[in-house]
């Protein structure tokens, strides 16, 4: 496929995506077509106005003065009617552009909720947000501005060419000075534009923030089933942005008609002045002849701008096509695979990993991993960085799919379960705690479909050793904790994350311990909170603390994507193998209790 064919195919697909909005656009184009044809006619009408509005020899007679005054009144009425049509046309055309933005941003955001982990691994947050925001704006140019420019300026050019050919060089053009009127009007409009722009930019920042937060925390959103909640939050911010942009469009659409009405009033005033004070029954004023020249000159001057606009259309389309390619890349990206149809109403928490293998491309990460985890057990996975521990937990959650082997949950292959059902039985407490720019209450009740009482949240906070510090916050559990819990300390953020998992009360917990040490007091209360969390569920821990491995029911030592040792702490120490070396090398003895 040639580049020209590719551009044509993409542009055609783009227009098909918004075909349901084309009626909206067609109405705007129709109104533009009518009133731009009238524009060309108005320029030509300078000829009869000046020729028949003056007496023999070009002077002003009583009869021609009456004609001029009638023409002045008629012109104001015509321009006013035309301006109303122009406003309607510009509003519909501008609204079409914003409807395209609104549609594509919704479609892309909804698609992001369904994309697999591999997509987020390949693309940075900035790239994704840029496609969601900036690229969509570029597409707007192709679906509104480019189409309208061809219709609008193409029609105008044709009309002006006709005028130029049928006119003659016999009149000069009145120059209308409207500076003071326009200056005052533009000053008022500019102030309103600045205020609307500030509101729009501020609301767009909220849209960007929510989108970035969603992308950064996509695992938590899915594990806790909060897709709809986050989607509603995003749409609320987007709705406000949309309303501000529509107000801006309306103001922009109003500006040009008002200026034209002011100009027509000045022109009418000039005609009245000539009719009243310029009457000369003896032959008139010869300098007011040559109407055909005036209409030709006006057409010649007016044709420059639409021709310039038409030359810019190709640039607009090329930019839009490049943006469209990126947008369709996201919309066409394969969704997270839903391989299962079974649903388990209740799970005990038995997890069996059989001969599991996985690779990222050519890089083998896991090879023949087998582990049996009984319900209620705490199993600690240890090993140096890159040994496959985190990848294993991601496969359990089905963010990745194994190439070989199987993972069983209570004897059922996890690939046979629906994603929503599987993840409803899992909780995650990440090494890097992910919290949302929301209240303590909403962070802990995050993603739960049922109504959660304040008492339930408080109970979870107490069990997580977090209620004491939450009580001291300005609004208690209804205090906003900032972006990713920025208003809290590291230990406090961890305890909020633990309280969230406690409230969900899933039978299987995946816990990736933080590698950085807390102060002794924070470490103590976090450990107590973890004990409360793990006592009622199966716990899979990526361990970084000596106290964790000492208390685990089983320790699995991984190296190079394989299980090399397995057993209890003391048993492995007595073997004197890789685990003993990792204890001496990797674990800080100050964590031991």
From Swiss-Prot:
<dbReference type="GO" id="GO:0005524">
    <property type="term" value="F:ATP binding"/>
</dbReference>
<feature type="transmembrane region" description="Helical">
    <location>
        <begin position="146"/>
        <end position="166"/>
    </location>
</feature>
<dbReference type="InterPro" id="IPR017871">
    <property type="entry name" value="ABC_transporter-like_CS"/>
</dbReference>
<keyword id="KW-0547">Nucleotide-binding</keyword>
<feature type="transmembrane region" description="Helical">
    <location>
        <begin position="169"/>
        <end position="189"/>
    </location>
</feature>
<keyword id="KW-1133">Transmembrane helix</keyword>
<dbReference type="GO" id="GO:0016887">
    <property type="term" value="F:ATP hydrolysis activity"/>
</dbReference>
<dbReference type="InterPro" id="IPR027417">
    <property type="entry name" value="P-loop_NTPase"/>
</dbReference>
<keyword id="KW-0067">ATP-binding</keyword>
<dbReference type="GO" id="GO:0005886">
    <property type="term" value="C:plasma membrane"/>
</dbReference>
<keyword id="KW-1278">Translocase</keyword>
<comment type="subunit">
    <text>Homodimer.</text>
</comment>
<dbReference type="InterPro" id="IPR036640">
    <property type="entry name" value="ABC1_TM_sf"/>
</dbReference>
<dbReference type="InterPro" id="IPR003593">
    <property type="entry name" value="AAA+_ATPase"/>
</dbReference>
<dbReference type="InterPro" id="IPR011527">
    <property type="entry name" value="ABC1_TM_dom"/>
</dbReference>
<keyword id="KW-0472">Membrane</keyword>
<dbReference type="Pfam" id="PF00005">
    <property type="entry name" value="ABC_tran"/>
</dbReference>
<dbReference type="GO" id="GO:0034040">
    <property type="term" value="F:ATPase-coupled lipid transmembrane transporter activity"/>
</dbReference>
<feature type="transmembrane region" description="Helical">
    <location>
        <begin position="258"/>
        <end position="278"/>
    </location>
</feature>
<comment type="similarity">
    <text>Belongs to the ABC transporter superfamily. Lipid exporter (TC 3.A.1.106) family.</text>
</comment>
<keyword id="KW-0813">Transport</keyword>
<dbReference type="GO" id="GO:0140359">
    <property type="term" value="F:ABC-type transporter activity"/>
</dbReference>
<keyword id="KW-0445">Lipid transport</keyword>
<keyword id="KW-0812">Transmembrane</keyword>
<keyword id="KW-1003">Cell membrane</keyword>
<feature type="domain" description="ABC transmembrane type-1">
    <location>
        <begin position="38"/>
        <end position="319"/>
    </location>
</feature>
<comment type="function">
    <text>Involved in lipopolysaccharide (LPS) biosynthesis. Translocates lipid A-core from the inner to the outer leaflet of the inner membrane. Transmembrane domains (TMD) form a pore in the inner membrane and the ATP-binding domain (NBD) is responsible for energy generation.</text>
</comment>
<feature type="transmembrane region" description="Helical">
    <location>
        <begin position="33"/>
        <end position="55"/>
    </location>
</feature>
<protein>
    <recommendedName>
        <fullName>ATP-dependent lipid A-core flippase</fullName>
        <ecNumber>7.5.2.6</ecNumber>
    </recommendedName>
</protein>
<dbReference type="Pfam" id="PF00664">
    <property type="entry name" value="ABC_membrane"/>
</dbReference>
<feature type="transmembrane region" description="Helical">
    <location>
        <begin position="67"/>
        <end position="87"/>
    </location>
</feature>
<feature type="domain" description="ABC transporter">
    <location>
        <begin position="351"/>
        <end position="585"/>
    </location>
</feature>
<dbReference type="InterPro" id="IPR011917">
    <property type="entry name" value="ABC_transpr_lipidA"/>
</dbReference>
<feature type="binding site">
    <location>
        <begin position="383"/>
        <end position="390"/>
    </location>
    <ligand>
        <name>ATP</name>
    </ligand>
</feature>
<feature type="transmembrane region" description="Helical">
    <location>
        <begin position="284"/>
        <end position="304"/>
    </location>
</feature>
<dbReference type="InterPro" id="IPR003439">
    <property type="entry name" value="ABC_transporter-like_ATP-bd"/>
</dbReference>
<dbReference type="InterPro" id="IPR039421">
    <property type="entry name" value="Type_1_exporter"/>
</dbReference>
